Amino acid sequence: MAPKKQNGFMMFVNEWRNRNAEGRRMTLAEAVYHCGTIWEKMDTQQRGPYNSDAKDANAARRDKRGSLNGHGQVDKAQREAAESLMDKAQREAAESLMDMKRTTERLVLNAKMSHDLENAKFVFVAFNYFTKALTTDVYVPAEFAACEYSLKEGIRSIYSTMIDPGQIIFGQGSDALHNSSTTHDLPLPPNALGEKNMVKLYRNILDYLTKCQGEGKTPIVFTPAENIGMVKSCFRYLECEDDSRDGGGKIEVFDIQYLLFILKKEVMSVAGLNDEKINKFATDAFFKNDFFEFTAGIACQISSINTRDYHVATLIGLLPAQTINVYLGSTLRSMHEVLSDNDTKLTGYISFLFEVICGVALMFWVLQKARKELSETLLSADYNNEGKHPDVQV
């Protein structure tokens, strides 16, 4: 079936949705209904630019189709143009990957050169979502969690919140119900729990990241490689509601598995150990082994009641921190011995093993206490009311 031609009215609808936060919250059908009354009141002069844009779009689409030669093949020039676009996309992806690696390496190396690697702070994040659009990478977020981590202290602070987007993507109620029932088991909109104001929520997240990383810095967070696309999409979902932002200061999402690889190499370097056998394939394999899957008492009360411990966003955000502790434990102890012998500034490890055990125990206690307080508040409330759920910050 040939694609439908553009018309001036739909050009107006699309522009109105892009420019208004109210429009971005509407489905296409709702936006068409709303804009219909506005379009009827517009005169020919006001409609002119939109009708002209529609004609230009139709003409551009006809030109893009191009023509076939006598053998039914695409013209050589068109094929080369398409290949050029593919090459450009591949180059941009490669450049983005290299930029991520360079930035991660710079963060770790700067801390190492300033003799403060053990106190360097990193933020790990995780999202749960209700559903994903069928043809685009748009995710509707359901829950967010972040934790601040350092080699010396382990988990330093936790931020978590449930999210009520108000509605899910039109026609995907069944998909959202299936995803929820098989993962986080959170109630769907319009009965969802948590923060309803996306602008407030996004600014609260930025405030937490600024508190962790300092003023005037681009916020950088880490998440497992397979979740990077989903996490970026959820941040865009929250950010697009904020009309006051000019697009600056976006949150950068990096690969936590590459961070683990660089940390392992640099810690071994400080400890004077041979790191020639360390490679990313080995660290990735270790990271994907879940050593805490059957650990009891580390999820919130609601998740425990619903037998959904493994999918709660807070737990997803905390597991990488514990994995790094396990993987780097012996190497960090060796680094401490070398630094103690050389009388350097890194003298914080009196007994690293004891600190790790105490840190993990303290983390479990703090997490359980915070989530228990949250669950008691939620369980005492009626799930059919507005479900206002305050952010939780530990």
Curated annotation (Swiss-Prot):
Q: Please indicate if the UniProt record lists DNA repair as a keyword.
A: no
Which compartments does it reside in?
Answer: Cytoplasm; Nucleus
Q: Which GO terms describe its molecular function?
A: transcription cis-regulatory region binding
Q: Where is this region: Disordered?
A: 44-93
Where mainly located?
cytoplasm
According to the UniProt record, which residues make up the DNA-binding region? 2-69
The GO annotation for biological process reads: germ-line stem cell population maintenance; male meiotic nuclear division; negative regulation of DNA-templated transcription; oogenesis; piRNA processing; regulation of miRNA-mediated gene silencing; regulatory ncRNA-mediated gene silencing; spermatogenesis
Kindly state which keywords UniProt assigns to this record, in alphabetical order.
Answer: Cytoplasm, Developmental protein, Differentiation, DNA-binding, Meiosis, Nucleus, Oogenesis, Repressor, RNA-mediated gene silencing, Transcription, Transcription regulation
Q: SUPFAM superfamilies recorded for this chain?
A: HMG-box (SSF47095)
- Which Gene Ontology cellular-component terms appear in the entry? cytoplasm; nucleus; P granule; perinuclear region of cytoplasm
- Comp. bias intervals (Basic and acidic residues): 73-93
Task of the protein: Involved both in the piRNA and miRNA metabolic processes. As a component of the meiotic nuage, plays a central role during oogenesis by repressing transposable elements and preventing their mobilization, which is essential for the germline integrity. Repression of transposable elements is mediated via the piRNA metabolic process, which mediates the repression of transposable elements during meiosis by forming complexes composed of piRNAs and Piwi proteins and governs the repression of transposons.
Do you know which PANTHER family this protein is assigned to?
A: PROTEIN MAELSTROM HOMOLOG (PTHR21358:SF4)
For this chain, the family text in UniProt reads: Belongs to the maelstrom family.
What protein name applies here?
Protein maelstrom
Organism annotation: Drosophila simulans (Fruit fly)
Q: What lineage does the source organism belong to?
A: Eukaryota, Metazoa, Ecdysozoa, Arthropoda, Hexapoda
Quote the gene name from the UniProt entry: mael
